[in-house]
Structures are given as C-alpha cells and as structure tokens.
Amino acid sequence: MDVNPTLLFLKVPAQNAISTTFPYTGDPPYSHGTGTGYTMDTVNRTHQYSEKGKWTTNTETGAPQLNPIDGPLPEDNEPSGYAQTDCVLEAMAFLEESHPGIFENSCLETMEIVQQTRVDKLTQGRQTYDWTLNRNQPAATALANTIEVFRSNGLTANESGRLIDFLKDVVESMDKKEMEITTHFQRKRRVRDNMTKKMVTQRTIGKKKQRLNKKSYLIRALTLNTMTKDAERGKLKRRAIATPGMQIRGFVYFVETLARSICEKLEQSGLPVGGNEKKAKLANVVRKMMTNSQDTELSFTITGDNTKWNENQNPRMFLAMITYITRNQPEWFRNVLSIAPIMFSNKMARLGKGYMFESKSMKLRTQIPAEMLASIDLKYFNESTRKKIEKIRPLLIDGTASLSPGMMMGMFNMLSTVLGVSILNLGQKRYTKTTYWWDGLQSSDDFALIVNAPNHEGIQAGVDRFYRTCKLVGINMSKKKSYINRTGTFEFTSFFYRYGFVANFSMELPSFGVSGINESADMSIGVTVIKNNMINNDLGPATAQMALQLFIKDYRYTYRCHRGDTQIQTRRSFELKKLWEQTRSKAGLLVSDGGPNLYNIRNLHIPEVCLKWELMDEDYQGRLCNPLNPFVSHKEIESVNNAVVMPAHGPAKSMEYDAVATTHSWIPKRNRSILNTSQRGILEDEQMYQKCCNLFEKFFPSSSYRRPVGISSMVEAMVSRARIDARIDFESGRIKKEEFAEIMKICSTIEELRRQK
C-alpha cells in the first residue's frame, strides 16, 4: 500500500515537524586523508577578508603579518575584518555602564582562580599539539613532555604545580637563545628470527637530542596544529579546526575564565549555560520584548547567521577588550591576560600532513610533506590546489603559514560572545535615541536579534543600524542566510522557539542506542538517555516505551544475550541456555546474562542490578558481585560514572549514570600492537604518569581530597600524609609499633633520596 507521507503530518502542528528535516539519522560524514587543503583555504580566506590591512614583518620569526585593525570602513556588503578599536572600546564602556561593576567583579573572581589553578588543568582536553615532537599527542603527555624539556633547560618555576608558575616558565622560555629537546625517532633493521629462521624487520625506538634556536622555538611555541573537523552534519565541504600547543593553552584558559565570568552576568549570553537553563534565559529576553512591545509597537526577530565569524575576528581587538576590562587591575594580572591575544596575533598555522600522490600505474605512492610546498614544482597539482599554494607561499616558514588575523575555531568562544553581547546591549532606547530598539541573544557566533519599532520602516532602520554597528567591530551578519519573522518564531543554537521552545528531538537521536563500553555501563547509559529525554525533550510515554523496547533489542543483538528460552542461535546461546536452565528465579538474571527485561518507563532511574537483586538466586548474586572474580579487572567504582554521549550538534557531552560494579563492568585491555611502534616511548611515559596519579589518589582518597594549595610537591605531600596517617593508626592501635617504625623509616629514605637527586 502506498502511503502519502504528508498524511502523517495532518494532525501535527508544523513547528513540531521541524525535527524531521534534520540530517541527524545514520552515520555522520568523516574526513579521510589530509587536512592540508582545508587549512590553506582557511589561511587564504582569512587574509582575503583583511586584505586592505597593513603588512609588517615579525622581527623574531621573520613571518609576514597582516594587520586589518582600523582599516578602511566597508563600502559594500562583503565580509571584512576591519574592526575599529575606538568602536570596540566604546561598546565595552556602554556594556559596563548598563552593568555597573561587572568587569571589576569578574576580574576579582578570575584573579582568585588564577592563583589557585594547578598546572594539571592543562591535562584536560584531548589531542594537543606537542611542540617537542611536532605532532599531536594526548594532552597529559604533551604537558609532561613540555615540563620535562623546560626542566632540562633550567626552567623550574613549575615545580610547585601552579599553572601561573608554569606560564612564567613559558614566558621565560621565549627569551632563551636556544632550547634543547628530545625527539623520538625510529630505526628499522633486518634481522633473522631465531625461532622461524625468517628475516624480520625489527624496529627500535631512539631518542635523540636536538637544539632549537630562538627563531625555531618561537615558531613552534606559536604554532596551532590543524585537523579536519569530523562528523559535521548538513555540510558538503569539510573545514579545518586548530589545536594549540601547551605554551598557548594556559593563557587562553585564563582569558576564557574571565570572559566566562562576564558571560554569566549577561542576560543576553547563551554561554556558558546549556540545556534547560539556557532555554529559560532565552525565554526571558523574548518575554521582555513581547511585553514591552505594546499594541502600538511591532516586534520582529531575526534568526541570525554570521559570515565566517572567527576568520573576521581579530586577536588585536581582543587585546583591546582585555586592556579595557582589566584597566584598574594589578599589573601582573593585566600582563597574564594580554599574552594570549598577543600570541594569537603572531600565530602560525601548521599545514598538516601534506599531500599524497599516486602514480598512474598505481604502483607508487609518495607523500609530499607540508614543508615541501614552498619549493615544489606546481605542475604536479590540479588547478585549484595550485592557486591555493601560490597564494599561501609568501606566508610559509618551515611548513607553517603565518596567520596573524582571524581566530581559528573554538579558541575564544566566551570572549567573542562578550563582544557580540556588547553590540546587542547598544539596542536600548537610551542608546539608539530613536523610536526603534533591539535586544537579542548571542552564543559564540550564533545570534538572534529582536527588533521593536512603531512601524515596518522603523524595523528596517533598526536592522540596518544593527548591521552597520556590527561591521565596525568585525562582525558580519549574513544577509543571505539570516531571516526575519514576527517575534514568536525563531531558531537559536538549534533551539526552535515557537511561543516557547519546541523540543527538537532529532538532535538527541544519535545518543540513543548501545554505547559499546561494557554490558553494565551500556545498559545504564541506554535507560538514562531515555529518562533524560522524557524530562527534557518531550519524549512522550508511548514513544519512550517503544524506544526502550528497541534499545533492549539492540542491546541483546550487540552482546548476543538473547533470552535463555529464545530460538535465536548465537555464539553465546549454548552458555546462556545452560545458565537459564540452572537458574531457579529466571527473572533475576540480568538481560546481559539472557534474563528478561524488567524495565518500563516508571523504573528507568534504578540500576538493573538493584532492580533485580531481590529476585536473584543466591549463588548468582555471589558470582555477579564478587570483587575477587579473577575475570574482572576492577576499577574502584564511584556510585556515579560519566559517559560521553553524542548529541547531534555541539561537542560530545558528558552524562552521568549510576554505576553498580559487577562482573559485567569489565575494562578492555590496550591493543598490544602499539608496543612495536614509535609510540612506545610515549605509552611508557603515559603509564608512568598514570601510576603516579593513581598512587597520589591512594594517599588522598576523594573524601579528603582538596586541591593542594601551597608549594609542596606530590612526593612531599604523600610522605607527610603517610606520616600523619601512620601516627593516627598507631595511636588508635590499628597498627603495631614495628609497622609504625617501618613506615617512618621508608618516609625518611624517600626524603633522603630526593635530597640526593
């Protein structure tokens, strides 16, 4: 039978059907190969938007730099990055006037945080450009390598573990004549295998010392490595994103801390809050505009889109903003905060892996690394790539491109939001001094603008004025991609507003299903996602019940744990049937052991083990929750774990779920093939790091774990803690005198060894 799909929507209000048009089912597109082309696009575009600026040469690195600040005022609607310093400063001043004390208070909050933040803050985050190895590494490893190199070059401020001291080292490192680093390299040689008598290739990992002169070191310190952004839906072309090195990260973190503190106090800011809190904040602004537009006034809303937000932003503008925001603060604080924008004004973009060439006969493949693009003959490239390379050549130094204007994705989300809000703030009647006025919402590069005026001409005039004001600070509202509607219907950060926010359920689709962590976590995450969507996203009871059934089905297929009385044959069915037959109370078996599903939408908040505990056979309970079970490598499990779920837009978000430790909470072991590669040295460093952290956690269990404030090292802290604990245990009779003496002796030995080192 043919079904006319439009019939499905007859009873559905149009706004609720919006989510069916979203590209969120199925796998998102991933990029393959090199991101070099996308990075060159970004660099070339950024320079094009600022082309009428002034060219200068960086005296330290020799990099050509383009400065568009205070450039010509725009004469057309093309996007441009010519922000006017005085306009930005004035916008800041008006923002402060409407929010008395906002900058002052945020500075005080930030100053406190700056003095307390530990350097381990930088271990958060995933891939980071590791300047010592000139490629990406996990953040913790990149930080450890950086500190190790600093230490071997005589920089020791970071011993105490405060981030601010590490940043002092960074600043000092930039004045050094040269830096000595250790790099990993790989040797291959052919040897005869004793067992099989065949020739095999043996790889050995070498570490070699290398000296970087001041220029080379500065280039590396200012480098952002680039990658292709993966899993972006609804786009035909991929784009490049940047990952900064350890020298830049700490400074950016403090600037963003200050900006976050300001954003929290601004009602128009969509950051840093999220979810329902964000919806409530936005609904307030809309309500204000609706109630104030009396019967005589019209109110319209623009669902806004900005052209190339971060390619038109400029670090020099951010420097001006920070200089203004911190103007009455102590000198040291102003200096710390101004370093990030200064580094960004001198940044270099690493072009990535370069290009791969294949010969026509397909026998030969060769990699052209980015370093060669400056000198290689262009006849090998196709037309579009040739144009890109020609354009970028004047900017190249050692395989990196000088990129002074523009901000690369996701670096200063909070601070750029402050800039956007400062323009929205100018829409108050006391500033527009006419009959029209505006307000709105800003979240990084996304905005919604609400304009009120007595008539249509007034609305048009208000929009024009907003558009031109934005141009003055380097924000380019796209006239093609923004659209205007009567207030009451708009979209902002993928929230659809129609007299209240409509649940855009399709956003959550990717997070339904089996996560693939382990049987225990997956069950818990699956039901939590359904529960959360019933709370937050209008997932109705009938649909939730269906989602639950589909999830259980999916789960059983993933782990091949169909019910013990099923006809389905899998590798596991023999064992599961045997278990089913031996079990008296079959309802007590977990789904992952072939048991029935007891979940319904009323009990989703209860972990499965708790739900079935009373129904379990005693010997099954004993096997399931046995910490001595040799088949399980047990983590000490907190009562709540965090899972990473992938909503459709924005970064992966962390979601809490209840974790009950059972023999199903296994942790997969690391793939051994890594041990034969050049990554091996890095892996060993990482394990060492892990061991130290675990040891530290043992001494300071989470109940008593406060961030150490003071200047003792981890070892000193652990030794003094051991002494205190030993004394308490000895005095309360928990340990004998000999044991107490032995602990004290070990502590003294450790201290002695440290002194000798």
Curated annotation (Swiss-Prot):
Annotated RdRp catalytic domain residues: 286-483
Catalytic activities: RNA(n) + a ribonucleoside 5'-triphosphate = RNA(n+1) + diphosphate
Location in the cell: Host nucleus; Host cytoplasm
EC numbers: 2.7.7.48
UniProt region (Promoter-binding site), positions on chain: 249-256
GO molecular-function terms, A-Z: nucleotide binding; RNA binding; RNA-directed RNA polymerase activity
Keywords: Eukaryotic host gene expression shutoff by virus, Eukaryotic host transcription shutoff by virus, Host cytoplasm, Host gene expression shutoff by virus, Host nucleus, Host-virus interaction, Inhibition of host RNA polymerase II by virus, Nucleotide-binding, Nucleotidyltransferase, Phosphoprotein, RNA-directed RNA polymerase, Transferase, Viral RNA replication, Viral transcription
Region (Disordered): 50-82
Record GO biological process: DNA-templated transcription; symbiont-mediated suppression of host gene expression; symbiont-mediated suppression of host mRNA transcription via inhibition of RNA polymerase II activity; viral RNA genome replication; viral transcription
Post-translational modification: Phosphorylated by host PRKCA.
UniProt superkingdom: Viruses
A family per Pfam: Flu_PB1
Gene Ontology CC: host cell cytoplasm; host cell nucleus
Signal peptide start-end: none
Biased composition (Polar residues): 55-64
Short sequence motif Nuclear localization signal: positions: 187-195, 203-216
Disulphide bonds in the chain: none
UniProt main location, coarse: host cell
Family, similarity comment: Belongs to the influenza viruses polymerase PB1 family.
Function: RNA-dependent RNA polymerase which is responsible for replication and transcription of virus RNA segments. The transcription of viral mRNAs occurs by a unique mechanism called cap-snatching. 5' methylated caps of cellular mRNAs are cleaved after 10-13 nucleotides by PA. In turn, these short capped RNAs are used as primers by PB1 for transcription of viral mRNAs. During virus replication, PB1 initiates RNA synthesis and copy vRNA into complementary RNA (cRNA) which in turn serves as a template for the production of more vRNAs.
Subunit structure comment from the entry: Influenza RNA polymerase is composed of three subunits: PB1, PB2 and PA. Interacts (via N-terminus) with PA (via C-terminus). Interacts (via C-terminus) with PB2 (via N-terminus); this interaction is essential for transcription initiation.
Protein name per UniProt: RNA-directed RNA polymerase catalytic subunit
Native source species: Influenza A virus (strain A/Grey teal/Australia/2/1979 H4N4)
